[in-house]
Amino acid sequence: MWMTPKRSKMEVDEALVFRPEWTQRYLVVEPPEGDGALCLVCRRLIVATRERDVRRHYEAEHEYYERYVADGERAALVERLRQGDLPVASFTPEERAARAGLGLCRLLALKGRGWGEGDFVYQCMEVLLREVLPEHVSVLQGVDLSPDITRQRILSIDRNLRNQLFNRARDFKAYSLALDDQAFVAYENYLLVFIRGVGPELEVQEDLLTIINLTHHFSVGALMSAILESLQTAGLSLQRMVGLTTTHTLRMIGENSGLVSYMREKAVSPNCWNVIHYSGFLHLELLSSYDVDVNQIINTISEWIVLIKTRGVRRPEFQTLLTESESEHGERVNGRCLNNWLRRGKTLKLIFSLRKEMEAFLVSVGATTVHFSDKQWLCDFGFLVDIMEHLRELSEELRVSKVFAAAAFDHICTFEVKLNLFQRHIEEKNLTDFPALREVVDELKQQNKEDEKIFDPDRYQMVICRLQKEFERHFKDLRFIKKDLELFSNPFNFKPEYAPISVRVELTKLQANTNLWNEYRIKDLGQFYAGLSAESYPIIKGVACKVASLFDSNQICEKAFSYLTRNQHTLSQPLTDEHLQALFRVATTEMEPGWDDLVRERNESNP
């Protein structure tokens, strides 16, 4: 959870190296080709080879094999599995049918399918088996995918995942929250609350904590109470909270009435850090677009896209655009979802490349084309495309998880340096960093011939200045702890005299330890701090946990946002808050449901 310093031997993927001892412990081997770990039991490839990922797969899928505990038994088991002699878990036909039904319900939830589509899946499987394996058609008799059963099973999976999260949360040394009130593109009445916690061995867990209905919790006090209730249920107190990541809406960051100020006030304690808040990670492109769209460009383009979807759908020149649109949110889309899709750098760049075709299309359907003769509007369009492309690149960098908060903050600082450079270049009319604007300016020069002012540099300097101020405001707290982030990202090169007084003795001792220096060189930072003795370095270890708990990416929020935009019509159907939370937990979690526990729970409820 720190910036990755320059090291002589370290590579980014060192944390993903297969360890031989995992074979007996978790029944996995290194695959013959590629990265990851190959499970000897189910032959599934576990792509992310971190020990916690391998362990979670084993605990969720193959708990049965824990009965082979002695070293000799374990070694014999591995050898049998290598030869394909699989000791089969003693599941009854009913239990196998229940596992299959649960797995299918989870898949339906992941794909955002409606409750009633389980019956269709059942019919498809029945037709397939009758034609291919007629002797096995009877196995479907125990698989129930009716709407009511599908709902119940999704809720059961949600409870199982939530219990796993709560069991881990009780051991969190520190945690942070991400509060997202902008994910719902169909209606703004839910707050998604995500948690990122760090366990005793610096194992990081990111998951959905709860969904809060803003219709029922309209006031900040009511929101605060709902969040506190969820934290209490998870066995967490505010004294362990280190950071808050939010959108920059007034509901979140209002100076006197925002939820952030309210939570920071409640979290004040002699034994905890001041809560670190930053509000620029979530929906960076979407929310920043409102600051840089100086001429309501996106609203105009939105009208064009609606026309294309209704009257130009068969035109070959627009097929790439329509395919891109449908891959994001399906064939049917509401106005707000379309508007949000247009506020992405990738989308605007594609539309800019089709502007000539769009002008011809608008002429053919009798729509106005006045914007294409408006010099100012065209320049604003080109500038918007370029600045949103730069924001897209930053957003992509912030979408990479497990890079640590300090590394993410490095990306922010680098972007701010770029903004300063953009300011100077615009002032000098140097459009090297603005290829779309340069293209528009060149076209206008060819059309006008005379030497006249094509674009106003001051206009775009003001936009860049506004963006700079917003970034400064959003990441103010990270600047406040920048020295701390640098210290724990590179402890062996940080001068002790610049460190806080409380940590100088430990830091000096750490830097003098040759063994620790060697470990630091060959391990990634997470592994290094996980192995650091809490008895010898209690302050460094404690702060390492806190730094590791800060959200380092917007990945989990983007995953939720993407899930909603792809399945907006399914999720717009009448759903209880409980069902909505279950769907989003299944869609965003990296945990595997405990299938054995779910089957056992089903048997106990249906003796």
Curated annotation (Swiss-Prot):
Cystine pairings recorded for this chain: none
Matches recorded under InterPro entries: SPIN-DOC_Znf-C2H2
GO molecular function annotation: identical protein binding
Main location: endoplasmic reticulum
A biological process from GO: response to insulin
Domain of life (superkingdom): Eukaryota
Protein name as it appears in the record: EPM2A-interacting protein 1
Organism listed in the record: Homo sapiens
Taxonomic lineage from the root: Eukaryota, Metazoa, Chordata, Craniata, Vertebrata
